[in-house]
UniProtKB/Swiss-Prot annotation:
(6S)-5,6,7,8-tetrahydrofolate binds at L121, G125, H126, L127. Gene3D superfamilies: Aspartate Aminotransferase, domain 1, Type I PLP-dependent aspartate aminotransferase-like (Major domain). The gene is glyA. HAMAP family: SHMT. This is Serine hydroxymethyltransferase. Pathway: One-carbon metabolism; tetrahydrofolate interconversion; Amino-acid biosynthesis; glycine biosynthesis; glycine from L-serine: step 1/1. One of its GO terms (biological process) is tetrahydrofolate interconversion. Its cofactor is pyridoxal 5'-phosphate.
């Protein structure tokens, strides 16, 4: 049989077995990592299409390769759809990831050595917002801002630091922060010091698309996002900007940072943007929010707090909950491992003023997007919250909790058509 036409199982049973095992893991467990979601079958079909074969350096109508007439159509559809979804003047759908979207935006707006401001990593920021070991911390002078004692971004500190440091760019966005940001206040501060405002909405873009979270696009010069997480599409990135900055942004992506775009992924992005414009998507995002609030409310009850578990900022406005374990018998790694043994996948996460090392941490980040995509409603999220609350206590019935996790997974079959 020709290798060109062999199936994965026929050609490479070792890789096929690992893929099959991962499918089973996703089907049989509860995915609660806040940055993860389940891509629709149509999205995966587009990503696995023949578009993976096509090189297309450049942009629609201006390519450096022949034979791009069909990928031009696909990419323009993606551009038009995401501009409409968020009300943006311009969009670049080529970044391979959110990190590359952030890098390209910074390359377009900054010079090495310029000053930037971003949320401190331990306070909820992202690597690309100025961490020293990241390109953003190596190329630019970074002035981090922080959350206050209540766990909310300290806008007075942001304003003070901006006036003192006169940054060229202020980054508003986060990777582990449970509250909404005041984009209008960030823009006012940016304007006062002559800085660009870049919003990284990778985590909450789906909520914005559904009208359940303030839209940063009217306030920011540039907005970056991933296309997975709450958007629920393929893994990739996007940059939205004003028309005035579009040429700089496009040049920073190609040829500045990337060569050929991944047109099969761009096709998958286009499909996911169509889904995100629909009513079913909006209803799912509401269940995502409701689920996170149900979880947060359960974890602040006395039977949980008395064993040293607390919720940062006291609750959530978004799709995730940050759990503080500093006063618990468990550290972040132990809590993650315990939930994993029960069939619930979360991730340990640093919290503000965390006394433990990064690979251990004193916190958990727990998200609801994947379960909402799977179909979970309020009753189901209440059951999940009860399971997690029980598991974080010193004494718990592992067998009972495992059985309850299995029952929830079986109630909402995932990808039943995939074998």
């Amino acid at each position: 049989m020709s290798l060109l036409n062999s199936s994965l199982h026929e050609l490479d049973p070792d890789v096929a077995a690992a893929v099959d095992a991962e499918l089973h893991r996703q089907q049989s467990t509860l995915e609660m990592i806040a940055s993860e979601n389940f891509a629709p079958v149509a999205v995966m079909e587009a990503q696995g299409s023949v578009l993976t074969n096509k090189y297309a350096e450049g942009y629609p109508g201006r390519r450096y390769y022949g034979g791009c007439e069909h990928v031009d159509v696909v990419e323009q559809i993606a551009i038009d759809r995401i501009k409409a979804l968020f009300g943006a003047e311009a969009a670049n759908v080529q970044p391979h990831s959110g990190a590359q979207a952030n890098a390209a935006a910074m390359f377009a707006l900054l010079k090495p050595g310029d000053t930037i401001m971003g949320l401190n990593l331990a306070h909820g920021g992202h690597l690309t917002h100025g961490m020293k070991i990241n390109f953003s911390g190596k190329l630019y002078n970074v002035v981090p801002y922080h959350v206050d004692e209540s766990g909310v971004v300290d806008m007075e500190e942001v304003e003070r630091l901006a006036k003192e440091s006169q940054p060229k760019l202020i980054v508003a966005g986060w990777s582990a922060y449970p509250r909404q940001l005041d984009f209008a206040a960030f823009r006012r501060i940016a304007d006062e010091v002559g800085a660009y405002l870049m919003v990284d909405m990778a985590h909450f873009a789906g909520l914005v698309a559904a009208g359940l979270h303030p839209n940063p696009v009217p306030h920011a010069h540039v907005v970056t996002t991933t296309t997975h997480k709450t958007l629920g599409g393929p893994r990739g990135g996007v940059i939205l900007s004003t028309q005035e900055l579009a040429k700089k942004i496009n040049s920073a992506v190609f040829p500045g940072q990337q060569g050929g775009p991944l047109e099969h992924v761009i096709a998958a992005k286009a499909v996911s943007f169509k889904i995100a414009a629909g009513e079913e998507f909006k209803e799912r995002q509401q269940r995502t929010l409701d689920g996170a609030r149900i979880l947060a409310e359960r974890l602040v009850q006395p039977d949980v707090t008395e064993v040293g578990v607390s919720v940062l900022s006291g609750g959530t406005d978004v799709h995730l909950v940050l759990v503080d374990l500093r006063n618990s018998e468990l550290d972040g790694q132990q809590a993650e491992d315990r939930l994993h043994e029960l069939g619930i996948t979360v991730n340990r996460n640093a919290i503000p003023n965390d006394p433990r090392p990064p690979m251990v941490t004193s916190g958990l980040r727990i998200g609801t997007p994947a379960l909402a995509t799977r179909g979970f409603g309020a009753e189901d999220f209440t059951e999940v919250a009860e399971i997690i609350a029980a598991a974080l206590k010193p004494s718990y019935d592992a067998d009972d909790l495992k059985a309850r996790v299995v029952a929830l997974a079986e109630k909402f079959p995932l990808y039943p058509g995939l074998k």
